[in-house]
Regions:
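Gly/Pro-rich turn-and-neighbor structural signature
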Residues: 1-95, 177
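Structured mid-domain segments that build the active-site/substrate or prosthetic-cofactor binding neighborhood
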Residues: 75-81, 87-177
Length: 177
């Protein structure tokens, strides 16, 4: 299934107190990490991200995990399905926050590897969902084999730069011209 990438509590369901303590601990670690980076770069580092997936999303949703100011919160799809989990809709967005997405076109563990299968409509669905949510500050895509995924890579780039231009059928026609 999901390989080794899983929440810290997958095999042992924690209490709310444990979740709260975990969130506070991780929040302090994020702040310390940002402070170290800023010190090491004489304050020149200007872009910070944190990718939420499973436990990160759950801790943010409950208000236990807080990020330092200026950190872009990045939401990841569940790689095998290439869809966002239920937590995607439940995590609150702050008015002045920065948000983005991490999306898989390819996944070694159990998704497409040599043959693309995401399809333009699924890609459109996910990109439109992110765009409509306001998660537009950061886009990153995971694809391990570029050669087999050029068609989808171009579609992803086009939709990230101009969602209004990206219509699956129109893209297909332009690509084939």
């Amino acid at each position: 299934g999901l390989g080794d990438d899983r929440p810290i509590w997958q095999d042992d369901v924690p209490t709310e107190k444990v979740l709260e303590k975990s969130g506070k601990f991780i929040s302090k670690a994020y702040q310390k990490e940002k402070d170290i980076i800023l010190a090491a770069t004489d304050g020149k580092a200007g872009h910070f991200t944190s990718t939420l997936w499973m436990e990160g999303s759950a801790l943010v949703e409950k208000g236990y995990l807080k990020f330092p100011e200026g950190v872009t919160m990045v939401f990841a799809d569940t790689a095998p399905t290439q869809l966002y989990g239920d937590e995607y809709d439940r995590v609150p967005r702050e008015k002045d926050g920065k948000y983005g997405i991490y999306y898989h076109l390819q996944y070694y563990g159990c998704g497409p590897h040599l043959v693309p299968q995401t399809g333009l409509k699924k890609l459109y669905y996910n990109m439109k969902l992110a765009y409509d949510k306001g998660d537009r500050d950061y886009f990153i895509m995971n694809v391990s084999n570029v050669r087999e995924f050029v068609f989808e890579l171009k579609a992803y780039a086009e939709s990230a730069w101009s969602m209004s231009r990206y219509v699956p059928d129109d893209y297909l026609n332009r690509y084939c011209e």
